[in-house]
Amino acid sequence: MGMYKYIREAWKSPKKSYVGQLLKQRMIKWRREPSVVRIERPTRLDRARALGYQAKQGYIIVRVRVRRGGRKRPRWKGGRKPSKMGQVKYSPKKSLQWIAEEKAARKFPNLEVLNSYWVGEDGMYKWFEVIMVDPHHPVIKSDPKIAWIALKHHKGRVFRGLTSAGKKGRGLRNKGKGAEKIRPSIRANEGKGK
């Protein structure tokens, strides 16, 4: 087996391999860090490479922490029955991974999100690493594999649900019978697709 296959096998079931112990130590440190942190190199090299990361100028890795659970809605100031306050049982209709990608994009507005992957979780948080690309960097513009991201119609792609996590959240992995209300978009079908 090659190096990447060993890494992939270890991450398939982290608790059973050496990854579990490493994650425990890492998360103690990660909890103290800000929610969005730029890092030097990917934690899961195999996953990052599979999703398009290259170790060259113009590629940036960002680790993002997202709170687990449903959506935390703002609390009303006026009087209401507790059951009518609209505090519980509301979900954001987006995966936590998609939310993490958006957080990274807001922190680094000059970069575009390429993709992301899971790196850890505990009872309170989930961590994702987001691969970001500088569309104005000459190295990126001259690489035919990634130069497409510099085109103007890819600007703000994460906020339009065009990343892998975004497309999954919009139901675009499904086609055929049962997926009639998914395309062209959820909104075009008056929200009936979700």
UniProtKB/Swiss-Prot annotation:
Record's keyword annotation contains Zinc-finger: no
SMART domains documented for this protein: Ribosomal_L15e (SM01384)
InterPro entries according to UniProt: Rbsml_eL15_core_dom_sf, Ribosomal_eL15, Ribosomal_eL15_arc, Ribosomal_eL15_CS, Ribosomal_uL23/eL15/eS24_sf
GO cellular component: cytosolic large ribosomal subunit
Family membership: Belongs to the eukaryotic ribosomal protein eL15 family.
Signal peptide annotation: none
Region called Disordered, residue ranges: 164-194
SUPFAM superfamilies given in the database record: Ribosomal proteins S24e, L23 and L15e
Designated name of the protein: Large ribosomal subunit protein eL15
Domain of life: Archaea
Record organism: Pyrococcus horikoshii (strain ATCC 700860 / DSM 12428 / JCM 9974 / NBRC 100139 / OT-3)
GO terms classed as biological process: cytoplasmic translation
A molecular-function term among this protein's GO annotations: structural constituent of ribosome
Keywords carried by this UniProt record: Ribonucleoprotein, Ribosomal protein
UniProt feature, compositional bias: Basic and acidic residues: 177-194
Biased composition (Basic residues): 167-176
